[in-house]
Amino acid sequence: MGRGLHVAVVGATGAVGQQMLKTLEDRNFEMDTLTLLSSKRSAGTKVTFKGQELTVQEASPESFEGVNIALFSAGGSVSQALAPEAVKRGAIVIDNTSAFRMDENTPLVVPEVNEADLHEHNGIIANPNCSTIQMVAALEPIRKAYGLNKVIVSTYQAVSGAGNEAVKELYSQTQAILNKEEIEPEIMPVKGDKKHYQIAFNAIPQIDKFQDNGYTFEEMKMINETKKIMHMPDLQVAATCVRLPIQTGHSESVYIEIDRDDATVEDIKNLLKEAPGVTLQDDPSQQLYPMPADAVGKNDVFVGRIRKDLDRANGFHLWVVSDNLLKGAAWNSVQIAESLKKLNLV
């Protein structure tokens, strides 16, 4: 089945929602009806899709009557309230928030890694955290060939991961500082938290709120989601997540330990050359390596700077970059929808 699909996009006016619409159009995703939904505040907004002007409607339980696939990206509270209502009315929900990711009955899917988990869905499929998606997509081919027992990651994440308001704050702060004007941070690192810091010309080692164990919620998302997606509950994972003053594109320095001592850098490169959804950019002699500015607007995960650890024969270092609004959100969601069609699950 594929014809006659009715697709709804919830959060259609947000950064990720806009990218979802662009991705659906770019992929020529086959459907008969597209419904755009948002909060009451954004209802009435006009959006163009494939040359046709559509009006965004206020999301309600009744909005999902007749919907086959609902792509959610309007915040966790909206997903918690409306995703079950969509499922009750027969829709399959692909949710881009953290609301259901660690629910044991909800598959958490990166199609290049665990597409088969889609068979186990009960109406809701969770899209992982942006920084998790790009990392596991890069690590899965290595894990399949050589095993994996440890992952240590430091992330360098773009401001767009915190939403449109954060991007506007980056722009306004940058302009103010260049003009030697005073700034009053209001959003970063966490809107509504006790303190706010300058993001322009700065690096903030906090993404989301701190937990009792000293890790941030973002770091714990990476740790727990990686184990779930890879079906490796005993995998050792540690993460440090940092916000940088760039608009789009997350970068990650990843250290891994595999189960064998005999793998070479060339072995790892050859695996990644053939990996779906991965582009290898790694030639130190030509200063070729991934950078976020080059990844913007592209669906792939880019990997480079692959080195064998100098002390541990089973250790490797990688640099992983991706567009956080595409593979980290919109493209992975649409990929899941495409997989549902391919597997005849919708």
Curated annotation (Swiss-Prot):
| GO BP, one annotated term | lysine biosynthetic process via diaminopimelate
Highest rank taxon of the organism: Bacteria
Q: Where does substrate bind?
A: Q157, R243
Query: Which residues hold phosphate?
Result: R101, K221
Phylogenetic lineage: Bacteria, Bacillati, Bacillota, Bacilli, Bacillales
Write out the residues that bind NADP(+): T13, G14, A15, V16, R41, S42, S160, G161, N324
Pathway given for this chain reads: Amino-acid biosynthesis; L-lysine biosynthesis via DAP pathway; (S)-tetrahydrodipicolinate from L-aspartate: step 2/4; Amino-acid biosynthesis; L-methionine biosynthesis via de novo pathway; L-homoserine from L-aspartate: step 2/3; Amino-acid biosynthesis; L-threonine biosynthesis; L-threonine from L-aspartate: step 2/5
Q: Do you know which Gene3D superfamilies this protein is assigned to?
A: Dihydrodipicolinate Reductase, domain 2, NAD(P)-binding Rossmann-like Domain
Main EC class the enzyme belongs to? oxidoreductase
Kindly list the GO molecular function terms attached to this UniProt entry.
aspartate-semialdehyde dehydrogenase activity; NAD binding; NADP binding; protein dimerization activity
Record-given protein name: Aspartate-semialdehyde dehydrogenase
Phosphoserine PTM positions read S98
Q: Which family does it belong to?
A: Belongs to the aspartate-semialdehyde dehydrogenase family.
- Species name: Bacillus subtilis (strain 168)
